[in-house]
Amino acid sequence: MNGSKFGKSINGLLVLFLFLVFIIPVVTIFFFDLRFYYIPENEISKFYIYSLIYSTLGILAAIIIARMFRKEERSKIPNTIRLILGILWIVDGILQFQPEMPYGFLSVVIEPSIQAINNVGVEKFLMIGYNIWLLHPFQFDALSGSLQIFIGVAYLLNRSTKALNYISFISIIWALVIWIFGEGLGGIPESGVSLLTGFPGSALIYIILAVPYISPKLGNIKNLQKYFTYTVSAIFLIGGILQIIPGNTFWTKGQLAYDIYMNINQQGENPIVYAILNHTYVYLLFRENYLNIFMFLLMIASGLFILLHIRTGLILATVFVGLTWLLFQDMGIYILPATDPNTGLPLLLMLVILIEIDFQISSKRIIKGAAQGVSVT
């Protein structure tokens, strides 16, 4: 299988995987929201009218941009990145339209993040965004979701270098706003921050994925490989260091099991996910003595192996991130009110991108070597 066919296969499988991962949870979430979360009919009607108008304008803008730049030179960045960003942004936008979001986003998502920060200056800064949102919660929530829909659709419809450059600037700016105000700087100022539970924040991963579209140097496949290799390695190595800091309490018996326990009783939890979490919680509760050192070694080994271009590191990291996304992050979208799939899925997809790039470079080397062999003989 050549690089082109492999890339198309990856893209097809990714779209199918993301569709299956998201469609059932999103339907489940909205079903339970509309059933259990009360909001006055006149207010919910107003909210969805705003959302419909803004989303329609956003989609039209994305279509116009696609038509404007359809004859421009196509981007050399692997198509997988564009598809991943597009789907993730659209899902995030849809989740922002949940009935409880105008007010629940502040009380359930933002307030706990602000309260967990042990820095008065950072706390006051984040309260600025909190108070602005509170002035017009329905309009701001509708605008927020619609902007994310626009970014996602624009990524899916556009393939030209110029268009993706402009879209990525918007994507990076908005992701930065989300990372600061919505994710509390990815939890970095909080005690107990960990790669297991969401460090460094999904929005920061979105920024990392969008950077290649605004950096001409990363149009070269080898430079792109270095960029993702260094970035992914840094995330795992820093995650390993955070895991062994005594102040983060992961050495405390029962802490890791407690992190899973907090996800078990989520309203609207999928029965299959519930069963997996419950069994894991019971298992860890009595066998946690050496688990934290194992987590630390796994993160450090993954980071170093990836940095040294040892493919075992990519396999270790992929399995690790997949399991932690399910067990410790509850797939993000099940932690109500869900606003995104948490850090696990974007990081997992970034590893898939690195695997694809690594395969493309290896294929080119094989083809080049074969061509040189033929010419010599």
Name every feature range the model reports, one short phrase each:
Residues 2-150, 154-377:
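Extended, low-polarity transmembrane helix blocks
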